[in-house]
Every structure is written in C-alpha cells, then in structure tokens.
Curated annotation (Swiss-Prot):
Annotated organism of origin: Laribacter hongkongensis (strain HLHK9)
Cofactor note: Binds 1 Mg(2+) ion per subunit.
UniProt keyword list: ATP-binding, Ligase, Magnesium, Metal-binding, Nucleotide-binding, Tricarboxylic acid cycle
Protein's job: Succinyl-CoA synthetase functions in the citric acid cycle (TCA), coupling the hydrolysis of succinyl-CoA to the synthesis of either ATP or GTP and thus represents the only step of substrate-level phosphorylation in the TCA. The beta subunit provides nucleotide specificity of the enzyme and binds the substrate succinate, while the binding sites for coenzyme A and phosphate are found in the alpha subunit.
TM regions (residue ranges): none
Protein name as annotated: Succinate--CoA ligase [ADP-forming] subunit beta
Reaction equations catalysed: succinate + ATP + CoA = succinyl-CoA + ADP + phosphate; GTP + succinate + CoA = succinyl-CoA + GDP + phosphate
Biological processes per GO annotation: succinyl-CoA metabolic process; tricarboxylic acid cycle
Amino acid sequence: MNLHEYQAKELLAKYGLPVQQGILASNADEAAAAFDQLGGKFAVVKAQVHAGGRGKAGGVKVVKSREEAADVAATLIGKNLVTYQTDANGQPVNSVLVCEDMYPVERELYLGAVVDRSTRRVTFMASTEGGVEIEEVAHNTPEKILKVTVDPLVGLLPFQAREVAFALGLKDKQVNEFVKLMTGAYRAFVENDFALFEINPLAVRANGALACVDAKVGIDSNALYRLPAVAALRDKSQENERELKASEFDLNYVALEGNIGCMVNGAGLAMATMDIIKLKGGQPANFLDVGGGATKERVVEAFKLILADPSVKGVLINIFGGIVRCDMIAEAIIAAVKEVNVTVPVVVRLEGNNAELGARLLEESGLKLTSAQGLNDAAEKIVAAVGA
C-alpha cells in the first residue's frame, strides 16, 4: 500500500525527520489560504498521486501569489495526472500539497531503503545525486550509490549512519543531524512495516540544515492487519478498480495492457502462462492467480474481473489440479460463462486432479469453450482466436 507525499511526511515527522512544511488543500480556495498561511514569497503546489514523475508531467508548480496557487490547484484537482509511472489514464488528483519554498539549496542528496530479498534485511541506499530518479543513477553512475545493510538483531548503529554522512560530504553539525534523521527513518521503517522508503531530494539548505523535500513510502500490505492507523490512510481512488475488487475475494490480480485475459492457479504457472502467450505473439491483459485452494465462487468472480476489462478479446484458463479439482473449476467456468454472458473466445487447459472429468463437463455444457491439450496448444489457440 502506497502513501501520499503528505501522509509520508506526517508519518516521518513523528520520528524526528525534518520535513518540508506543507498544507493540504482539496480546492482552489484552500490552496490560496495555504499560500497565505505559509507566509513566503513563493510556494510549491504538488499534486497528490501515487506515482513518480509528477514534475515532468506538470504536477509540481512554483507559484508566486495566492491567486496563482488557486489557479494551479483548480487546474490539477479533479483531473487525472499521467506520468511515466502511470497507465494512459493516469491517476486522479483529489488534493494538492502547498509547500514552503526551500530553494535555492546548496545540494540535493538521496536517501532510501528497501527490504533486500537476497540478504533478507533492510538495506539503505544513499547518493550525492539527489533530485533525479535513482534508477538513472544506478544505470549511469552506479558507483555513486552507497549501500548499508542493517542487522535486524542490533538495528541501525550510529557508526553506520556516520559513515553514510561522511560519504555524502556532510560536515560538523550536519553529521549529527543526519545520524538522527537516518536512525529515525530506520525506526519508522521497522515499526510501520515499510516495503519502500525514499527521500528524494534530501536538501542541504543554505544555512546548512537538512530537509526532506519529498518523501515516498510504501507499506507491506501483508502487515496492515496490525497497523490499523496506517491502514486507515489507504486511498482506494489511486488503485486499479479491478485490482481493488480482486483483493476483496483474495485474488491476486494485476492489470496489464494486452488483450488476452488469463486465469491461472499458482503464481509461477501464471507467469509461465503469460510468458508463453508473449512467445506466441500475444499480449496478456492481466496476471490473475486464483490460488491453490480456489473455490467455485472465487473462480466466478475471477471471470467477472477479467471480462470487466474492455480490452480483453479472449480468455485463457490454465488450471493444474492439485489441491483444487479440475471438475470443480469446470463447473465454475460453466456457471461464470452463463452468468456473465461471455462473447469472447475462451480456451481452457485442465491438467491434474479430475482433469478428464472436468474436460467432459466442459464438452457436455454446450457452451463455446475450446479445450487445449497442453500449455503450448492453449497459447497457440488463444492467440489465433484473438487475431494477435
């Protein structure tokens, strides 16, 4: 689950991080009032969406008056912002953050942290190249990224934070300030089950003070059950409608941009199914794992989810019966096709537990369902059916 910038800053401020002052506004009048309240000659109006690249997309504007703040807010709020991290529809802007102007600054740094799957530990990343996408730095000048792995038994130690501060060229009081900042960030990361944390840029102001100008936080969704206060920050308007619906039925669904809907049991098999569709010249419209213990109801809902996507021109169902029985899946497919009134080609491949019985049920249903013998055959048939 992602947080908005204003939510991330409010959370990090509780752990002592020096964040840029800002006021949330949900309309033009509130934006104008926020400009007055900040009391500066300039302010920065930032669209609040769950996506990076806002500046290049016109979602971050410097304003010089309350009228200009109101105009920018009116332009952004109620619209969708399209960035390189969104799809063609973009993300809805429901509010803007009116922030104090902190520029010019002496330098822009980067500080971030993730859970490194290879070490299974929190790993901090820091760089002198702040203000740009860290992916660009990693690609062009990877030597400029410093990594620090934290031992979970002892936590982040002061000497580790000091080493990072020195590597970033910080001096005197800045070192102690950075140690407090990084230590607070680690506490926030662990106590709130972060999956991702970024301060970009971490500004060194003209007076030498550090300030978090932007903040990005992603929460591990599996931990939300024990984080009620954080879970309450969820903004469902920023999530894909079908993905949101899928979560209600414990379906693992990710929307893609192709035209072949996929329903598979098991994440590994789902990825293999998408791979072979691509290999045969098709484009998957989604990743959908109904799980090893799929029920009839979940399969019906999965079918509805797939067909709710107007770009879907055909559906490939690939089921390996282990825990789940293929005849039960077949019954669910038949019920779903009848209930949803499917008009696109549907190719079904069943293997494993009661596969023959399942295939017979599909054949005797009288519905226009195409059976496939093997994954290769299934992919070829669905790609041919949609004319990919």
